[in-house]
Amino acid sequence: MRWWRVAAILSIGVGLGLGWNAFSGRGFALDKNAFLRPGEALVEISAAETKTRLEKGALVLDARGLDFYKLAHIPGSYSLPEEDFERAFAALEPRLRGTADIVVYCAGYGCEASHNVVRKLAQKGVYAVILNEGWPAWQDAGFAEKEGDLP
């Protein structure tokens, strides 16, 4: 096989991979700080810091799917699933725009949903931090949990 054919096949493969990554909505984050204000980066906080902020009036958002939210979630948190972001954002927008301190969490340990939701929020002018290691960190800390579809 000639070198140019190898280069062409490789180029097509890379192009298709990058295209899939860019448009699938579930691709790998090539730049985890995309769509944030200049000079800002994704900020992660601990479960203890999340609890402190929640007690001071922070809004906590669960980026997991609604079924997981109903099984158990942080008391007072609202469901904002990554896969249903636009609909859920529209319902929560007035509350989000009126809150300065927002924390987002997901299933933790490699889950990118909270990162993706924070980026989508930033695109809409709403800025949030991430609960590092998400729901498992909250559970491991022994903090309260709530079942059902209400905060």
What residue ranges belong to the model's regions?
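Active-site neighborhoods of enzymes that stabilize oxyanions during catalysis
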Residues: 142-151
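Short Asp/Glu-rich motifs
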Residues: 72, 140-141
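Catalytic cysteine-centered active loop of the rhodanese-like fold, especially the PTP/DSP P-loop
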Residues: 93-139
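Positively charged, proline/Ser/Thr-rich regional signature most characteristic
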Residues: 38-104, 108-110
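Flexible, polar/low-complexity N-terminal or interdomain linker segments that lie immediately upstream
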Residues: 1-71, 151
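Residue-level detector of anion-binding/catalytic polar loops
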Residues: 59, 127, 144
